[in-house]
Amino acid sequence: MKHKLMTSTIASLMFVAGAAVAADPTPVSVSGGTIHFEGKLVYAACAVSTKSADQTVTLGQYRTASFTAIGDTTAQVPFSIVLNDCDPKVAATAAVAFSGQADNTNTNLLAVSSADNSTTATGVGIEILDNTSSPLKPDGATFSAKQALVEGTNTLRFTARYKATAAATPGQANADATFIMKYE
């Protein structure tokens, strides 16, 4: 009987102690991380869509045998820059210039690199063309053909492709370019 009473008492005390801990009203705060907020206010005719500001254009995979001569190109891959909240009373047209590391052999092309320590392809660069199929030198000063702005949303269309500068060797062929807008 004593044993049952002792077991019952211990079980009751554990339950009460557990309930006391669970009901602790003292809040606990811990560091959860950092959230970065980025944005920009612009005094311009339009605002660049957030989806257009940072995008990836997948050019695809090609055999080195596709490049048999200097100037050979791959298929053009379309991409666009979307402008929101445009007011054609502020500016009637928009144009884009791209900036990036130029290829050493052909400065009209972006130089390719590898994203990690992988082998980088050689003998090719990336060519950017505007909606009139005019190549855009990645110098930050060669602007695309002007596009007339309409009220609201406007889409500026471009293409990109690989272009041979020499005999191609296999490897990753990536590049980054920034762009600036010109409103007139």
Curated annotation (Swiss-Prot):
The keyword Signal applies. Residues 1-22 form the signal peptide. Fimbriae (also called pili), polar filaments radiating from the surface of the bacterium to a length of 0.5-1.5 micrometers and numbering 100-300 per cell, enable bacteria to colonize the epithelium of specific host organs. InterPro entries: Adhesion_dom_fimbrial, Adhesion_dom_fimbrial_sf, Adhesion_dom_sf, Bact_Fimbrial_Adh_Pro. Transmembrane segments: none annotated. One of its GO terms (biological process) is cell adhesion involved in single-species biofilm formation. Pfam families: Fimbrial. It comes from Salmonella typhi. Disulfide bonds join 46-86. The keyword Disulfide bond applies. This is Type-1 fimbrial protein, A chain.
